[in-house]
């Protein structure tokens, strides 16, 4: 049986994770330090599609390991409806495959303006 595209992608995960950690070590360490210092009482995620599935996995990991509740917020709240969210004691985590999705970027900007660590 021929190897599927999904099987190839799954097999690439360890190398992709290593590349991410090697290339982003400074940013990851800075984010971890900011989270430790701020100690948010709640976290929110901003994502679409398959990235939202990754956010759901993150939700369970954070809730189980750190005891911090995590909720998903809709990017369109900021990008379409232009409504601010009060996120003063929150960490806001954006997940995007490209890092350039306009609605995710806009929600992250809005969350920062609303007081979130983003």
Predicted regions and their residues:
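Cofactor-/ligand-binding subdomain signature composed of acidic, glycine-rich
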Residues: 1-39
């Amino acid at each position: 049986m021929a190897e599927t595209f999904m099987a190839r992608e799954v097999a690439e995960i360890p190398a992709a994770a290593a590349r991410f950690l090697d290339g982003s070590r400074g940013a990851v360490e800075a984010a971890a330090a900011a989270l430790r210092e701020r100690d948010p009482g709640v976290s929110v995620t901003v994502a679409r599609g398959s990235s939202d599935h990754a956010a759901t996995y993150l939700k369970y990991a954070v809730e189980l390991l750190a005891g911090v509740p995590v909720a998903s917020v809709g990017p369109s709240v900021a990008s379409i409806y232009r409504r601010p969210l009060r996120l003063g004691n929150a960490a806001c985590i954006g997940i995007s495959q490209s890092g350039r999705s306009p609605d995710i970027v806009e929600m992250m900007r809005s969350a920062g303006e609303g007081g979130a660590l983003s």
